[in-house]
Amino acid sequence: FDVTRNGSKYYLTTNAAGTAYTRLDQLTIAGTSVGGATTANDITITVISVNSATGAIVDFDFAGTAQAGKFLAIGAGTNGAVSIDGDTWTAEVLPALGGGNWASIADGLQDDGSSTFRPSIVMVVADGVSTVAYSSDADTWGTTTLPGSFNATGENTVAFGQITSAIARFVVISDADQDVAYTDNGGTTWNITGTALPATGYGEMVYGAGKFVAINSGTTSAAYSTDGVAWTGVTAPATFAAVTDIVWGN
């Protein structure tokens, strides 16, 4: 059988129908063979019908839950680590950088136009350089570069937002620039909006409740955007100047 894993779902097709099977025979593919754990991610296949002469599988049913998602940790240089459960970790080699360190991660589903396959993309940006890494499995990586006019020499942050049912957007900001870079296709191509943020200094950003929110550490300034392109600045109370990071939770 050929197995395709998408999120928590498996999709199976017959590779070789075999011989000498009978109806209601059951086969098991170990979860460890398809990127998960045994027995939690095993696939149980039930033979529904066979060729009356050869016993080759004609039709089958299957059940099983795929391992969906993993933890990814990033660090200096090419150093990273992944874990399925947060307990056991495996070293992960990230793409090499000419300078700087990988510093910010975001992930989100990408709509590929079908009803069943919606691949997840994890995107990593580095501080001090314009290199961006992206992957659908946090194992095999590709790299791309932010637009040349984007000043990536500072602290850079990426966040993901589902803007509409058809627009899945990654947004990158830097505390060295007012411009905002964004991609709607998982990093394949990038767009830039000039002078989108109220000022430089915005180095932390999060998406939640339908908005991107960025903060300017050490000041009382924050900004928000529903699409990551058009931003509105706001002034927070004086105690806000001590804030250094932001997260959204529900």
Regions found by a protein language model. Give the residues of each.
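Conserved, function-critical positions that sit in or immediately flank catalytic
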Residues: F1-A66
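Surface loop/turn motifs at the tips and blade-to-blade linkers of beta-strand repeat domains
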Residues: L94-G98, L146-F150, G194-P198, A236-T239
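Beta-strand initiation motifs
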Residues: A56-I57, D87-T90, D139-T143, G187-N191, ...
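Repeated scaffold domains used in trafficking and secretory/extracellular systems
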Residues: G99-L109, A152-Q162, A199-G208, A241-G249
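Entry beta-strands of beta-propeller and related beta-repeat scaffolds
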Residues: Q67-A73, G113-V124, T164-V172, G210-A214, ...
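Conserved Ser/Thr-centered positions that define the repeating blades of beta-propeller domains
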Residues: S83, S135, T183-D184, S225
